[in-house]
């Protein structure tokens, strides 16, 4: 997971350096699709377990998914700032820390510790049902 984040960030930065926004977005798309597959596989595997083992596996799947979502959000922030800032708001994290490239490769536990909190104790804001962080452009209606 960390290697995938590092590769995505490097490819994204190379594309942005060359002003290849379409390529940068493709990097984000590929990274998010792979992250979604990792989440799907990990959550399905956790659901097949029972008791404490199931809880531990699902917790790890969520922790990993948060890390990958945070990395993707940092990458996309300059392109779709409003939606990315809304993600940050619902994670209930200081935007300066959340969007800092200094934290991009930190695990969820490392990131939470850098905020002065204990891993596993940070609370996020509840999402309303069927919530979308990225609103449609007026031309899409």
What are these regions (language model features)?
Residues 29-141:
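Basic, alpha-helical terminal appendages of large translation-related enzymes
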